Amino acid sequence: MKRGKKYRAAVARYDRAERFSLDRAVGLLKEVRYASFDETVEVHVSLRLKKNQTVRDTVVLPHRFRAEVRVLVFCKEDRVSEALAAGAAYAGGAEYLEKVKGGWFDFDVVVASPDMMKDVGRLGMVLGRRGLMPNPRTGTVSADLGAAVCELKKGRVEFRADKTGVVHLAVGKTTMDSAQIVENVDVFLSEMDRKKPVDVKAGFVRSISLSSSMGPGIWVVHKSEE
């Protein structure tokens, strides 16, 4: 893939083979950025996983950077007010099931009470391919609707390893304070370490890199190597 002049100039400002401390990597990412818009900062973590293993969970990042999250809650009528009071944009049962079935997607994340999952499951093909299907493992199927919605509104995000064993997660914006980006990355990495498969003894993390939307990747030293 041919890269533009600005990208090549950014790459020339540091040794791409070198691995930096997290603090320095974030600072360097800001130094070499060249885009005219507020880019998203992403962390990419390559994991040592067996073919039958995966990593999937959620984490609440301490510093929010996304636009307000629109939460749709599937629940019985007697729990609608509870969900809305917690901050859900929409809450209900049959009405919203039909709207989604008809192609309505004016929301960012879906929460469901356990007693609604039989009905929500019928939307598996519709919600699943968009990554919106509620799942107990990610806290989006919950009897405590208020807590589930509040966590999402506070900035809880899902992370999962792809087929190659790499986890990609947005952790900030380039205009954020560097310390906030560093803390978001630290919290995410700590949470991911806690979720590693039990039979992985050492070397769980192969490599870590940071990048902005348009910028080059910057290798980061994992804390176990510091």
Curated annotation (Swiss-Prot):
Q: Which organism is it from?
A: Treponema pallidum (strain Nichols)
A Pfam family reported for this protein in Swiss-Prot or TrEMBL: Ribosomal_L1
Q: Which cysteines are joined by disulfide bonds?
A: none
Family per UniProt? Belongs to the universal ribosomal protein uL1 family.
Q: Which domain of life is it from?
A: Bacteria
MF terms (GO), sorted A to Z: rRNA binding; structural constituent of ribosome; tRNA binding
Q: Which gene encodes it?
A: rplA
Keyword Methyltransferase among UniProt keywords: no
Q: Which NCBIfam families does the record associate with it?
A: rplA_bact (TIGR01169)
One of its GO biological process terms is:
regulation of translation
Q: Is the keyword Glycoprotein assigned to this protein? A: no
* One Gene Ontology cellular component: large ribosomal subunit
UniProt-listed InterPro entries: Ribosom_uL1_bac-type (IPR005878), Ribosomal_uL1 (IPR002143), Ribosomal_uL1-like (IPR023674), Ribosomal_uL1/biogenesis (IPR028364), Ribosomal_uL1_3-a/b-sand (IPR016095), Ribosomal_uL1_CS (IPR023673)
The free-text function statement in the UniProt record for this protein reads: Binds directly to 23S rRNA. The L1 stalk is quite mobile in the ribosome, and is involved in E site tRNA release. Protein L1 is also a translational repressor protein, it controls the translation of the L11 operon by binding to its mRNA.
What keyword terms does UniProt attach to this protein?
Repressor, Ribonucleoprotein, Ribosomal protein, RNA-binding, rRNA-binding, Translation regulation, tRNA-binding
**In its UniProt entry, what is this protein called?**
Large ribosomal subunit protein uL1
The UniProt subunit note reads as follows: Part of the 50S ribosomal subunit.
